Structures are given as C-alpha cells and as structure tokens.
C-alpha cells in the first residue's frame, strides 16, 4: 500500500455536510483495508483566489495509506460531487502523523486565549 496526502475544498454553503462527506470518504478507505493516519478539518478559510465567484471554502486534509484503486475511486467521487470545488491527491514517501502547520497555529492561538482568560479574570477581581 502507498501513502497519500489528500486535500479537498468544499463549497461554503455545504459546510454542514462536510462531516458526512468525511465519514463517507474515510469509510471507503478503511473498508478496502486502508488506514487514516491524519485527518484535519481546517474549517472555512479564505481562498487565495476566487473559484466560481466564491472567496471562502471549507478545507479538509487527510493522510492515508491505501491501494491505488481506492484512490481512483475517491478521485472519481470528488469529480462528480458538485460540492467539492478543488481537490489534490499527492503520493508521499511515508505516513505523516504529526499535526500540520495550520493545526499547530490553531492550537497555539487557542492556548493563548486560555492563558489570557484567567489573567483577565484576575485583573477584574483586583
């Protein structure tokens, strides 16, 4: 089996259905004997350039280990799903399991907010 990194962008009006799409795509990979090494839902983000007069999209990143036939099936599913604006499937040399730069930055921001909240409460109490 080979390792792949998959990124796809979903129409912002279909953001509620992203969880179902992820479940469907990961289910097809695991049913065929593949494994999901990393799954990150980056949420709605600004795109670098407009696509179909849209400026935002819902981003999802997956690192998987699977057979080529499953990846071909997944690519066909992306092609015929109107909600998927763009997708990219890249073959990688090894499984990538650590959080991406996007998720690390998100975790750092949330940690800073958690640190700032007790300080604000202490300042208000004084």
From Swiss-Prot:
GO CC term, one of those recorded? cytosolic small ribosomal subunit
Composition-biased stretches, type Basic and acidic residues, lie in: 104-126
A Pfam family that the UniProt record links to this protein: Ribosomal_S6
Q: Which CDD domains match?
A: bS6
**Region spans: Disordered:** 101-126
Could you mention a single GO BP entry for this protein? translation
SUPFAM superfamilies to which the protein is assigned, alphabetical? Ribosomal protein S6
Report keywords, A-Z.
Ribonucleoprotein, Ribosomal protein, RNA-binding, rRNA-binding
Residue runs in coiled coils: none
Q: Disulfide bonds, which pairs?
A: none
GO function term, MF aspect, one? structural constituent of ribosome
Top-level taxon of origin: Bacteria
Query: Which family is annotated?
Result: Belongs to the bacterial ribosomal protein bS6 family.
Q: What function is annotated for this protein?
A: Binds together with bS18 to 16S ribosomal RNA.
The protein in question is named Small ribosomal subunit protein bS6
Q: What organism is listed for this UniProt entry?
A: Aliivibrio fischeri (strain ATCC 700601 / ES114)
Gene label: rpsF
